[in-house]
Design a protein with these regions (language model features):
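Conserved Radical SAM active-site core
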Residues: 83-204, 208, 218-219
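Non-cysteine beta-strand/loop elements that form the S-adenosyl-L-methionine
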Residues: 206-217, 291-297
Length: 335
């Protein structure tokens, strides 16, 4: 059985250190289809990746990477909810075996945990990283090396966790990693609070989108995040664009993901996440064939004890009801 994300973080390699791992630890290649080519290689050959990287870097002068649209000049040292200026931090990186089965395969998902967050859920299970910003500053070159080392370790993909606020840095690092031989699919593993414009800039770069869709009710989103009242509307728009770009999840050898959308939803106490509405939205606005992970591992972490309605785990009946709703909505691919 795969480890939880918190267990993985305890055993993963600290930021920067993975770039120094000896190539001697290399496993068999993690690519699930020898004919597969990640989308970003075509964009790179066409010379468009460089232009996209430049456009994204310009956004940092008046930041609109997420729906908060703070318009802070991060290149001049200004910051907002995410707490970042022109640099970025990585907490840890390594093969992760606790993600969805199509990502894990035999050799794990090559997971890179970025520090800080633009959403700041009060129940965050990784609050030390997201809220407190634990991690180490790294360069674009080091991030590129980390991607390449994960590939050499046999990982099936490069899994970018909480990437929204560091998209320009990721694309810059990608430009460095490609000449080094990077050829794994990129996984954009996001909390779902992404601006539509940012996701559009990633068209042709990301192979696998894996967003959360946390809340259907603006009031719930506002209460249990850092006042992201527009979360339901923003997440819906971003996820529809992700689906337009990559479509349904496509699998290669061994059932390993190559391209497509994996959609996550965390069941919360008293149906505060609006699970019944979520599954109907997926079936209607995306497709009944969307790969959906209805997650039952909610536990009251960080500041959740201050909010009585979410200060407990969900019950078995609550989770079973969520699955019933998903099946009743016609969803066919439940993780």
């Amino acid at each position: 059985m795969g480890c939880s994300r918190r267990e993985f973080l305890k055993g993963s390699v600290a930021a920067g250190a993975l770039a120094l791992v000896s190539p001697g630890c290399s496993r068999a290649k993690g690519i699930a289809d020898e004919n597969f080519e990640p989308a970003y290689l075509k964009l790179h050959r066409q010379g468009k990746l460089k232009k996209r990287a430049e456009e994204l870097w310009e956004v940092l002068k008046e930041c609109t990477l997420c729906p908060r649209k703070s318009r802070k000049n991060r290149l001049a040292g200004e910051t907002d909810v995410c707490g970042l200026t022109d640099g970025f931090k990585v907490h840890s990186a390594g093969p992760h075996f606790g993600e969805e089965r199509p990502l894990v395969g035999s050799y794990g998902s090559g997971t890179i945990f970025f520090s800080n967050c633009n959403l700041l859920c009060v129940f965050c299970q990784n609050w030390e990283i997201a809220h407190r910003g634990d991690g180490s500053p790294v360069s674009h070159k080091t991030l590129a090396r980390t991607m390449l080392r994960l590939q050499k370790m046999g990982c099936h993909n490069i899994n970018l966790v909480t990437p929204t606020h560091v998209v320009p840095h990721i694309v810059r690092a990608l430009q460095i990693a490609i000449p080094g031989g990077l050829k794994l699919p990129l996984v954009y593993n996001t909390g779902g609070y992404d601006s539509l414009e940012t996701i559009q800039k990633l068209d042709g770069i990301v192979d696998i989108y894996m967003p959360d869709f946390k809340f259907q009710d603006p009031e719930m989103a506002n209460r249990y995040t850092k006042e992201a009242k527009d979360y339901p509307q923003a997440a819906a728009a971003a996820i529809k664009e992700m689906h337009r770009q990559v479509g349904e999840l496509k699998l290669g050898k061994g059932g390993v993901a190559l391209r497509g959308l994996i959609l996550r939803h965390l069941v919360m106490p008293e149906n505060l996440a609006g699970t019944d509405r979520f599954v109907k939205w997926v079936a209607k606005e995306l497709s009944p064939d969307t790969y959906v992970n209805i997650m039952g591992q909610y536990r009251p972490e960080h500041m959740a004890h201050k909010y009585p309605k979410i200060a407990r785990r969900i019950t078995r009946d609550e989770f079973h009801q969520a699955i019933k709703w998903a099946k009743a909505a016609g969803l066919k691919r439940l993780d």
